[in-house]
């Protein structure tokens, strides 16, 4: 029942899963530009991490405020999982295609609006913040080869920054 941006919604999810799940589970709490205090009060013995959408996505779950991002990376006592797309680049690309082709854009413009440049710029920012604040970061759903250059080689148990891809994106 997304978005899970409050401890109350998170408790509802845990309660529901306790009644219905046949597998081990945990949940992320979702950050927004204005719920950082709430996010930081979560019980991180139960919550697997903080989910951050750095590009607009579901409801109000965008976190594009530099102050909010810095606070999350500086104060998070747990893993930060980011969906990385640079909002300013997305907006500029969308405006460009709307100006050229009108408001009813075809789905073929999706990868042009949410471009490789938008992904790399945002992933770079997340990695820089993780290094600056010594935060544990997981980059969700990498979509460009260039983003791999942001990651270091070595055993996973020694990594501060990890990532994954979705097979259907390859």
Feature locations, PLM:
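Alpha-helix capping at helix-to-loop junctions
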Residues: 15, 19-22, 59, 78
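Metal-associated gating/positioning segment near the N- to mid-region
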Residues: 1-20
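Active-site mouth loops of central-metabolism enzymes
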Residues: 2-4, 23-35, 110-117
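A short, flexible beta-alpha/helix-coil linker loop
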Residues: 1, 56-57
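Histidine/acidic residue-rich metal-binding segments in metalloenzymes
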Residues: 37-52, 58-170
């Amino acid at each position: 029942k997304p978005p899970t941006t409050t401890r109350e919604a998170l408790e509802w999810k845990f309660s529901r899963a306790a009644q219905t799940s046949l597998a081990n589970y945990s949940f992320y709490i979702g950050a927004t530009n204005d719920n950082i205090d709430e996010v930081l009060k979560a019980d991180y013995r139960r919550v697997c991490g903080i989910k951050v959408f750095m590009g607009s996505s579901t409801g109000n779950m965008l976190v594009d405020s530099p102050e909010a991002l810095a606070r999350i990376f500086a104060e998070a006592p747990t893993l930060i999982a980011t969906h990385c797309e640079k909002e300013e680049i997305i907006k500029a690309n969308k405006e460009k295609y709307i100006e050229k082709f009108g408001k009813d854009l075809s789905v073929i413009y999706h990868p042009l609006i949410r471009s490789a440049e938008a992904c790399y710029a945002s992933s770079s920012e997340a990695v820089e913040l993780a290094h600056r604040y010594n935060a544990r970061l997981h980059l969700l759903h990498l979509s460009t080869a260039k983003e791999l250059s942001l990651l270091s080689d070595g055993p996973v148990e020694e990594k501060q920054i990890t990532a994954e891809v979705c097979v259907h994106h390859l």
